[in-house]
Amino acid sequence: MALELLSPAGSPEALRAAVQSGCGAVYLGWGSFNARRSAKNFSDEEFADAIRYCHLRGVRVFLTLNTLLTDRELPLALDAARTACRLGVDSVLVQDWGLFALLREALPDLPLHASTQMSVFTAGGANEVYGDGCERVVIARECSREDTAAICKACPAEIEIFGHGALCMCYSGQCEMSALIGGRSGNRGTCAQPCRLPYGFNGPAKNTYPLSLKDSCLADRISDMERMDVSCLKLEGRMKRPEYVAVITDIYARLLREGRKPTAAEKADLELAFSRSGFTADYWQGRHGPAMFGTRPENTPEPKELFAAARAKYEKDDARTVPIHFSCSCQAGQPVSLTVWDDDGHVAAAEGPIPEPAQNKALTATDLEFRLQKTGGTAFRCTDGSADVADGLFLSAGAVNALRRDALAALENARCAVPVRREQDFSPLPNLDCTADTPTLTVSVTTWAQAEALLPLAPARIDLPLELLAERDALPDFAGEWCAILPRVWRDRNEPQLRTWLAHAKKLGVTSALAGNIGHLPLLRDAGLTIRGDFGLNVFNSRSLDYLRRKELSSACLSFELRFPQMRDIQKLIPAEAIVYGRLPLMITENCLVQNETGCHLSEAGDAVPQQAPCRKPNDLQDRTGAKFPLLPAYGHRTEIQNSTPVWLADKPEWKHCGLTYARLRFTTEAPAECADIFRAYQTGAPASGPFTRGLYYRGVD
């Protein structure tokens, strides 16, 4: 299958720019449930017109419904998908597990694409969503050429990659920085882009931007994608100007069409259209580091000449035409007939009046062919045609024009015909109730010293990183449950090591594991451990819990973007958990922020982070207000950024009345004795003794 070029359409004008510049498909937002709610997006009428405009010109339309949804919003999102399906949309991109399951049942013939917000970066994850009905998977921007090739080889789904545009610092779908700092959720389409602000490393914020990545540009790596059977190359930019969309689409379309790399002039135009101190292709090449980062000054001038030329081209609306062919018969005593067809198998026909005997000059085949070839003002371009005209006949110019107009209108309708798709009722949620009267306290730790300090207090469960468990030959005596925390991010090449560690953990007496990614599930099924869903799965509604129940999870942690009433109203189809104490994770990043500052090379020795690594020492980022965000090392020499202050709810009653089975205390930077004190405070309901936040449990997110 040829590599599809997918362009952003943040507005009707941007859509026209993309189509006229040569894209194969567009993705757009309609309604409130898309990950770029700040884009202009489309009204109801504009959305219907957009689908017809695109389909007429052979361009597919993908609707983004890729945000997390509450129980109250799910029916509205389903209605939007039903309407889009009836209008002929070609696919819907989804993030929310509940909406995914709902759409697959209610609209079984509607193609679904797994949005990059599903955080898929392994073949196991891709196969999980493919097996549940996603025909295409948009993999993480951080995937390298080798990662992508492994996924393409091992998964039958179509694989889509980001080829050009902005790079988020955090793995998409896992970023909570905008939500927790300002209440604007990236998972709900309102990210405030705090990654573009200045931060200081272990000191006050200066004019440094350690979270601001350059835009990606893979224009000269297209042949790589084609060799490994990538299905779609996606251009990012629904928030950008239509002229920007036109420029980048035109260049990438040319490269695909001509099978070549970009010229120096084309690279310059891409950079002129928009860049942040240049471009990067480091993720694709399996690299990371300081060279990937850049900024764009606010006073950067607009490329007026480049944009004016692009605008002039797409405003003519005639660059993208459909080649057609015709055959006409004009015989005495019979209505004149015209058949037109395109190269995609669509055929249409029209009839005109019976030709009259010629009084003066008779109609010739050459004359009729010349008139029928005039398709100006339409989306069609006649490449060839023939007319069979009997001698001595006359047909008025008006009749010929009407005949051509009717035939082209019929062909347009054929090209824009809406496919017949089934619409079904969806099943009610099962009559299950795992609501608990009072939650039991569980703990997660990052060090053995923390775990040992908590053992005498008898939490119901202790969650430890799998890497820590791999270091031990035996576990301390503990009446509760030992639970392994799998790395939040890993790659297919890491799975042999993870499987070895899981087998070792099971021998030690570990009985369960936290799955924070859909790709964890095949690993944990094979390991024979009880699977508990972690916060990375973004459980936001009852249908998501039901989806995970059917995936045989024994419990799941609810999203910490939910307010307590929303948490309470979720039907507990499996035991539910919430994080009620701790520094909440803001980001998980492919770049090691400490390595970028110190020049450490320990990543060359393997993916496990050694104890002597500089990232094991206390490090933080400091913003302009003086808030300090601790940096913790993550498997694969990645970084997890923690919130500046911990959530404290020991003195609040609401979390005890949400039907939760488990309430988790998440320990990260705390000293062992501090962990024990905090656990006791939650047993007694004590107030906080230091700075704290209530998280989003009261204020919620936009």
Residue positions per predicted region:
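A short acidic, glycine-rich active-site loop
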Residues: 39
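N-terminal glycine-rich cofactor-binding segment that shapes the pocket for flavin-like pterin cofactors
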Residues: 90-91, 99, 108-112, 120-124
